[in-house]
């Protein structure tokens, strides 16, 4: 038997005695406030306590335990708590021990804390020990803010010298395999209720039988995620180097169709590194049938905490557990177990027979035939390594290829690396490694791991990473890509846990001068082209008549009010290719990881004015093209071209050149400037701008107390949330990962779906609708009060449109468009605050070309009729960086005016924000131009990319402050933040294992900087003035008599505002 509970009346069966409310009131209620189900405590439970009329955080419920504790002993405290009151956020609850001494100050020991919400019970656990026995020992529960009621269902305090460890286990279904071994699980058969067990984000209770010959079992209910279940801390009972056998008797209940997966998992927590999850075993359980779940594990290293837990069934299905045993085995037993289970290869590969040394065992063909070869093509194709390779022939589809099922060996939330060497029978095509996943609820997902351009001439490496958010019913990795009829050769194919990468340090940046032009002879002051050379067979010479002032954005960035150009320009003639033009080598002048701004005057000759011509400032970095800015020119005027770039890898040669117009068109360039930008100076300016745009003067006026008591009282003002909207892109699989969900909910208040609302996803085939993912994501957002953007109703770019729509014309296409917008907005009426109506209209023209000229405007009109409260947006990329001549701010403004002229109810301007090496002045210029439309501007898909996390953080800081400091910008959406779930490489803020990287830390620092904190005293007039950001605040007032805490809101606005604080 376990040790007795030293707390008296721990289940409140006898009412409130001998508990004592500390400065507040308490009473016992007999019904469960959160559920009509059986309560989680024993069947003898008397109900729960409500601690109310709390005016201080430390007020709660306490009990004197002096006579029932002793020095030198360790005690484990376990409580079941909740909160109640008029609030939505979670509240902190603490368990504390007060040690009172007659001859020395009182001590306080924090035992543990948790966060409770209004809708469910949570467990609060911890331990304490007493070194020297005090005069009085008091256990109490405290913590929620004043005004919030504290609910307590049970309290237990037990000595940790429980005799559970010494008991011989009962001969149950789950433990009779090892009747002589010692079970390290406490309370393995729930004969002592839920003692030593905890629920993981859900509820549980024990069903006890009145027949002493029948066992009890635990019921885990109110599960909203697959990973939620029952867990026990076994840290002190396992050791590295030993193997352990797990056996559990499990079942399921609820709306089960067929069987449901149940998993046994080990969680290894480390203070200095990411938490690891180790799959022990799995089984499939059905209603009313008990199944035995077995597996083995071994603890490597020395984790700070080891937790065993059971999880797996889909949300809404209850998990039943009758008994759990974990026995230590000998090393030899463990090795035999590994062999019997066909464990992965010795290097931790989860693929079996990766190099085909055992023939084609464990491999299968996905819509193709598999064969092994020592050579092909008369010995011209030989293995890249080893003695043989496999071929996938007679492929019937692009997705046909070699595959292996890894269901039994893959773990969720663990990063895997897949690598292969591939070759094609002929031609050149993309080869891709893909992971197919089917979940227990029949939902399917295809995860692209990596792709490479495969060739007939040589072997090429295919390498990438993947991670599973949820627990799969089936997981298969395969190689696909080339058209049917092309054979794919595979030399080896391995999948193994990825090695943890070393975080990047802040790079060393060589000394450089901000604003110094690194282009030689840019002004052409002496009338020669020294420093310049022609790229290609064109001719260069110096001409006169160009502007004598710097281009506008160069002036802004360099803070120069007067120009000093010579009025000369480089003229390139006899151009026979678009790439030909003036060039110079700048290898020694470019510093790694420095962001450079590009600015120049450009003009074209008369021969190119019959059609628009692109002019591009470009760099060739070891032969690779880097965009430095592009502008469209269709007249004889001088135009400014702007852009930016950064080089992050040592280069042997960096060449600057100007290119773009059609062959035969003369090209003129004047005043080309390339200079390092001073980001620190810009950020200092933006902070000042944000103070004007996002703050207002606030006067707190306090009432309810005597003026004499208020005068001189200290005040602490803490902003808890900035009202500036900040959101992120999420996908359906993301919300299966509790670590992802935790970061998202703590840092964002808006969401946009990556692809689940797009037409190609919701209706991949005509009449075949798929709204399941979107429905589940909307439900998730509503559950946590997350506002949503609808992205997108239509997409104008043809490559993003599903084949069946591409094949429609005329009235059939018009009807499909009408059905799409009607179905979507009727189905989700009022669910989305924004809609991107027709994505990327500056880059595509599918609907405009096939329907009448009013089609685009009609999309807006119909959407507004169906959901008049939703704000309707345009959405475009490269608006803010100068990289794309098709999507300049001027062209965007022209598109808006054209739609408005046709009656389209355009409500907002979306700038996607997929930006590289951003320059604040260029971004600000675009925002200033767009703001003339008088419409709200949102960054809708913001991400930045850099191989270095610190530089990535710098880029993100530039973009967030530019948005925050501009009065026309009303919100920012990130296009994701989690590694392996981003659309661009090197753009994540959180590593796949849940660790926040340096870029993510910068993001969190910026969020903290957007909060206002004030300490002061109430003035004689009973008020206190401060200037703070718009948003939610808490204020604490401490007078000579008492302390008061309340909340208030500073609404958006510029004029001073009075806020009445009633104490």
Curated annotation (Swiss-Prot):
Reaction catalysed by this enzyme: Endohydrolysis of (1->4)-beta-D-xylosidic linkages in xylans
Main enzyme class: hydrolase
E.C. designation(s): 3.2.1.8
Pfam family, one: Glyco_hydro_10
Superkingdom of source: Eukaryota
Record carries keyword Hydrolase: yes
Gene3D superfamilies: Galactose-binding domain-like, Glycosidases
Function: Binds to and hydrolyzes insoluble and soluble xylan substrates.
Similarity comment: Belongs to the glycosyl hydrolase 10 (cellulase F) family.
Protein name per Swiss-Prot or TrEMBL: Endo-1,4-beta-xylanase 2
Originating organism: Arabidopsis thaliana
Gene that encodes the chain: XYN2
């Amino acid at each position: 038997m376990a040790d007795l509970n030293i707390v008296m009346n721990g289940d409140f069966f006898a009412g409130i005695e001998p508990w004592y409310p500390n400065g507040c009131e308490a009473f016992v209620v007999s019904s469960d406030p959160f559920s009509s189900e059986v309560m989680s405590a024993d069947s003898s439970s008397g109900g729960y306590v409500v601690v109310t009329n709390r005016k201080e955080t430390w007020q709660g419920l306490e009990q004197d335990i002096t006579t029932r504790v002793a020095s030198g002993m360790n005690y484990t405290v376990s409580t079941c708590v909740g909160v109640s009151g008029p609030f939505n956020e979670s509240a902190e609850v603490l368990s504390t021990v007060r040690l009172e001494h007659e001859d020395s100050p009182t001590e306080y020991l924090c035992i543990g804390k948790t966060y409770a919400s209004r809708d469910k019970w949570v467990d609060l656990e911890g331990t304490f020990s007493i070194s020297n026995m005090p005069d009085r020992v008091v256990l109490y529960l405290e913590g929620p803010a004043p005004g919030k009621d504290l609910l307590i269902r049970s309290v237990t305090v037990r000595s940790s010298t429980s005799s559970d460890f010494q008991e011989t286990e009962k001969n149950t279904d789950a433990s009779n395999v090892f009747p002589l071994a010692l079970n390290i699980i406490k309370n393995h058969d729930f004969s002592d209720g839920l003692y030593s067990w905890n629920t993981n984000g859900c509820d549980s209770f024990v069903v006890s039988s009145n027949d002493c010959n029948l066992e009890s079992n635990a019921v885990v209910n109110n599960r909203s995620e697959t990973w939620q279940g029952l867990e026990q801390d076994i840290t002190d009972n396992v050791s590295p180097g030993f193997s352990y056998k797990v056996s559990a008797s499990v079942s399921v209940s609820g709306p089960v169709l067929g069987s449901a997966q149940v998993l046994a998992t080990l969680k290894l927590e480390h203070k200095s590194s990411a938490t690891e999850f180790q799959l022990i075993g799995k089984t499939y359980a059905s209603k009313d049938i008990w199944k035995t779940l077995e597996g083995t594990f071994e603890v490597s290293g020395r984790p700070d905490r080891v937790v065993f837990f059971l999880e797996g069934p889909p949300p809404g299905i209850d998990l039943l557990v009758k008994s759990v045993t974990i026995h230590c085995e000998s090393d030899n037993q463990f090795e035999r177990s590994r062999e019997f289970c066909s464990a992965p290869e010795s290097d931790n590969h989860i693929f079996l027979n990766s190099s085909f040394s055992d023939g084609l065992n464990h491999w299968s063909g996905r819509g193709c035939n598999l064969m092994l070869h020592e050579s092909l093509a008369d010995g011209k194709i030989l293995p890249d390594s080893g003695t043989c390779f496999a071929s996938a022939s007679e492929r019937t589809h692009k997705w046909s290829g070699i595959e292996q099922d890894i269901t039994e060996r893959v773990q969720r939330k663990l990063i895997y690396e897949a690598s292969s060497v591939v070759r094609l029978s002929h031609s050149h095509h993309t080869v891709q490694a893909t992971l197919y996943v089917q979940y227990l609820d029949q939902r399917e997902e295809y995860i692209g791991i990596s792709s490479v351009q495969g060739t007939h001439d040589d072997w090429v490496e295919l390498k990438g990473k993947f991670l599973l958010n949820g627990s799969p019913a089936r997981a298969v990795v395969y190689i696909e890509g080339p058209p049917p009829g092309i054979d794919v050769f595979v030399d080896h194919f391995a999948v193994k846990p990825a090695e943890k990468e070393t975080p990047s340090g802040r790079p060393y940046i060589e000394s450089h001068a901000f604003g110094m032009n690194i282009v030689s002879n840019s002004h052409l002051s002496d009338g020669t082209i020294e420093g310049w050379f022609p790229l290609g067979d064109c001719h260069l010479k110096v001409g006169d008549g160009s502007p004598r002032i710097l281009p506008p954005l160069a002036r802004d960035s360099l803070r120069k009010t007067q120009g000093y150009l010579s009025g000369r320009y480089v003229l390139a003639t006899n151009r026979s290719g678009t790439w030909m033009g003036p060039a110079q080598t700048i290898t020694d002048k470019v510093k790694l990881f420095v962001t450079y701004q590009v600015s120049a005057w450009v003009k074209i000759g008369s021969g190119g004015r019959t059609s628009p011509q692109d002019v591009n400032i470009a760099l060739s970095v070891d032969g690779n093209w880097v965009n430095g800015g592009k502008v469209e020119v269709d007249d004889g005027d001088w135009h400014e071209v702007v852009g930016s770039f950064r080089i992050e890898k040592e280069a042997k040669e960096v060449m600057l050149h100007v290119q773009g117009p059609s062959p035969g068109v003369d090209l003129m360039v004047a005043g080309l400037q390339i200079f390092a930008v001073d980001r620190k100076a810009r950020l200092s300016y933006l902070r000042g701008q944000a103070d004007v745009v996002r703050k207002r003067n606030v006067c707190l006026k306090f009432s309810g107390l005597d003026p004499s008591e208020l005068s001189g009282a200290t005040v602490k003002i803490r902003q808890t949330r900035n009202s500036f909207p900040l959101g992120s892109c999420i996908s359906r699989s993301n919300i299966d990962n509790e670590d992802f969900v935790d970061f998202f909910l703590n840092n964002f208040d808006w969401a946009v779906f990556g692809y689940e609302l797009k037409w190609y996803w919701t209706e991949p085939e005509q009449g075949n609708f798929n709204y399941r993912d979107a429905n589940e994501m909307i439900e998730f957002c509503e559950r946590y009060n997350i506002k949503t953007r609808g992205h997108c109703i239509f997409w104008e770019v043809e490559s993003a449109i599903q084949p069946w729509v591409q094949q429609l014309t005329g009235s059939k296409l018009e009807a499909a468009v009408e059905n799409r917008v009607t179905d979507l907005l009727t189905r989700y009426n009022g669910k989305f605050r924004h809609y991107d109506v027709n994505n990327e209209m500056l880059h595509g023209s599918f609907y405009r070309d096939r329907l009448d000229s009013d089609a685009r405007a009609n999309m807006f009109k119909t959407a507004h009729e169906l959901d008049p409260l939703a704000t309707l947006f345009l959405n475009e990329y490269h608006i803010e960086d100068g990289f794309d001549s098709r999507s300049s701010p001027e062209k965007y403004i022209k598109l808006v005016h054209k739609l408005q002229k046709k009656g389209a109810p355009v409500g907002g301007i979306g700038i996607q924000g997929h930006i590289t090496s951003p320059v604040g002045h260029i971004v600000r210029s675009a925002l200033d131009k767009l703001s003339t439309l008088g419409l709200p501007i949102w960054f809708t898909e913001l991400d930045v990319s850099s191989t270095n996390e610190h530089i990535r953080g710098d880029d993100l800081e530039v973009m967030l402050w530019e948005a925050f400091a501009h009065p026309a910008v009303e919100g920012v959406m990130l296009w994701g933040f989690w590694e392996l779930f981003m659309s661009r490489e090197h753009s994540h803020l959180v590593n796949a294992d849940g660790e926040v990287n340096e870029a993510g830390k910068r993001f969190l620092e910026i969020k903290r900087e957007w909060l206002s904190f004030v300490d002061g005293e109430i003035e004689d007039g009973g008020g206190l003035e401060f200037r703070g950001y718009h948003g939610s605040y808490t204020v604490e007032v401490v007078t000579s008599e008492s302390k008061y805490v309340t909340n208030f809101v500073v609404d958006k606005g510029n004029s001073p505002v009075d806020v009445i604080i009633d104490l």
